[in-house]
Curated annotation (Swiss-Prot):
Assembly with partners or alone: Interacts with CDC4, PRE4, PRE6, RPT1 and SCL1 as part of the fully assembled 26S proteasome. Interacts with pre-ribosomal particles constituent NOP7.
Other notes: Present with 45900 molecules/cell in log phase SD medium.
Nucleus found in the keyword field: yes
UniProt KW keywords: Nucleus, Proteasome, Ribosome biogenesis
Gene designation per UniProt: CIC1
GO-annotated molecular function: identical protein binding; large ribosomal subunit rRNA binding; proteasome binding; protein-macromolecule adaptor activity; ribosomal large subunit binding; RNA binding; rRNA binding
Protein name: Proteasome-interacting protein CIC1
Residue span of region Required for interaction with CDC4: 310-376
GO BP field: maturation of 5.8S rRNA from tricistronic rRNA transcript (SSU-rRNA, 5.8S rRNA, LSU-rRNA); maturation of LSU-rRNA from tricistronic rRNA transcript (SSU-rRNA, 5.8S rRNA, LSU-rRNA); protein catabolic process; ribosomal large subunit biogenesis; rRNA processing
Function: An adapter protein that specifically links the 26S proteasome to its substrate CDC4 which is one of the substrate recognition subunits of the SCF E3 ubiquitin ligase complex. Required for turnover of cell cycle regulatory proteins CDC4 and GRR1. Required for synthesis and nuclear export of 60S ribosomal subunits. Required for vegetative growth.
Length: 376
């Protein structure tokens, strides 16, 4: 008789793991949380959608204000306010625009919107004198029309010296255009040829592009670079100061999520390239909404401020019972001077310190009197 096996059949049983799966929190890959940008853009859309006061909309006779359309368009212009820790360009003045990458074209919707605007969206191309006959508007039309891009006029440096040499003629011609592209080999000579007025606006400041490959003019290189600027880049004018305005276009040009994409990408580039302190978003007629601040940069500024204050306190000395601020040179002079003569040597500093003290006391007494009168 066969013995029964005492071993139980090993059947695979799925036992629930006691260990809980760790929930991985998704962190924003950008410096500014996307939700914050979405909320800010939506709030600005709501704000600009509010109707204007009746006094602004209608005149005394009930007719529409002639400037209403312009005001309506202006109040929807979206912009970033970017504050840097120090000057963006230093002491030197730069005529060259900085190009920021964007996910959604800035120029394409601008051109579409210009169909019903006062000013048409037009593109000017400036080439070297030797290249002007190597390409025509028709050649560029064949290469660019599929992308909805049109170069309206092509000129060379010689034209600016002759045809548009007169101040009025030159300014009238340049002001027609919303985008000016120029061969990178001549862009540095254009401020003199175009005049300073052209560089007051971003839209009439020429953007340098490559037109040559292997030291030869190339239609392919030219058209590729035109497409790159038109479809994927946004020009900004870097200021000498610490505050940069980045114009993002009219709120009606793009969908809200497209503006959010562009804001994220632009902010990321600027934060990486500079010591950005803070970033805000607004329209021409709205309050400013905060998007970003860099605590490390703010801490650095605070540390510098504290250091300056400490240095100022260290420079204070007492002469004849008066607290006086002395420069490094005067402190050295004080060390070698006769102590009995310090009052006469630094009489000017002592008198200034006394005046400051008396004015501060007067201010305090006047404030206390004002408080007493308010209480009585």
């Amino acid at each position: 008789m066969a013995k029964k096996s005492n071993s139980k059949k090993s059947t695979p049983v799925s036992t629930p793991s006691k260990e809980k799966k760790k929930v991985i929190e998704k962190k924003s890959s950008t410096a500014i949380p996307r939700e914050r940008v979405i909320k800010a853009v939506n709030e600005l859309i709501k704000f600009t959608s509010k109707p204007q006061d009746e006094n602004n909309e209608e005149g005394n006779n009930g007719k529409k204000n002639l400037l209403e359309d312009d005001e309506e368009e202006l109040k929807k212009d979206l912009q970033l306010i970017v504050v840097n820790n120090k000057s963006f360009t230093g002491t030197s003045k730069s005529f060259k625009l900085k190009l920021l990458n964007v996910k959604h074209s800035f120029y394409k919707p601008w051109k579409e919107a210009s169909a019903t605007a006062v000013k048409d969206f037009k593109v000017l191309l400036i080439l070297k004198d030797s290249d002007i006959k190597k390409v025509s508007e028709d050649d560029l039309f064949d290469q660019l029309d599929s992308e909805g891009i049109k170069v309206d006029e092509i000129i060379c440096g010689k034209d600016l010296k002759t045809v548009y040499k007169a101040y009025e003629a030159r300014n009238a011609f340049i002001s027609q255009f919303s985008l000016i592209l120029a061969d990178d080999s001549i862009v540095t000579s254009l401020p003199k040829l175009m005049g300073g007025k052209a560089y007051n606006k971003v839209e009439t400041t020429p953007i340098s592009i490559r037109t040559h490959a292997n030291k030869e003019f190339s239609l392919t290189t030219l058209t590729n670079n035109i497409k790159k600027v038109y479809m994927n880049q946004l020009p900004v004018k870097l200021p000498r100061g610490t505050t940069l305005n980045v114009h993002l276009g009219n709120l009606e040009w793009l969908r809200p999520e497209e503006f959010v994409d562009n804001v994220e990408l632009i902010s990321e580039q600027l934060i990486k390239a500079y010591q950005i302190r803070s970033i805000f978003i607004k329209t021409n007629r709205s309050p400013v909404l905060p998007l970003y601040y860099n605590q490390d940069v703010l801490d650095e500024l605070e540390a510098k401020k504290d250091k300056i204050e400490e240095t100022h306190e260290d420079d204070m000395v007492t002469i004849d019972g008066v607290q006086v601020h002395l420069s490094t040179f005067n402190k050295g002079l004080m060390e070698i001077a006769n102590p009995s003569e310090l009052g006469s040597i630094f009489s000017k500093q002592i008198n200034n310190a006394k005046k400051r003290s008396s004015s501060e006391l007067e201010k305090e007494s006047s404030e206390s009197e004002a408080v007493k009168k308010a209480k009585s």
